[in-house]
Swiss-Prot record:
Residues 6-79 form the Carrier domain. Carrier of the growing fatty acid chain in fatty acid biosynthesis. It comes from Thermobifida fusca (strain YX). This is Acyl carrier protein. It is found in: Cytoplasm. Keywords: Cytoplasm, Fatty acid biosynthesis, Fatty acid metabolism, Lipid biosynthesis, Lipid metabolism, Phosphopantetheine, Phosphoprotein. GO terms for biological process: lipid A biosynthetic process. The modification O-(pantetheine 4'-phosphoryl)serine is found at S41. Pathway: Lipid metabolism; fatty acid biosynthesis. The keyword Lipid metabolism applies. It holds the Pfam family PP-binding. 4'-phosphopantetheine is transferred from CoA to a specific serine of apo-ACP by AcpS. This modification is essential for activity because fatty acids are bound in thioester linkage to the sulfhydryl of the prosthetic group.
Amino acid sequence: MAYSEKEILDGLAEIIDEIAGVPAAEVTPEKSFVDDLDIDSLSMVEIAVAAQDKFGVEIPDDQLKDLKTVQDVINYIQK
């Protein structure tokens, strides 16, 4: 199933809020996981696993390091 950018953003915001405690309203496409949202590598792995389950995509560990912003993850899921 193809998801819209808004559906993915809303889903990611919910996941990030649950895992890292960042309010969903602060999660916007241009935000960097490390610099803006203060998410560490362990939380990033948890977010990736939750996103894989929610959106039915696979995000290999070697790809995870290239996903620096929320928009990067949105683009990856839409591929």
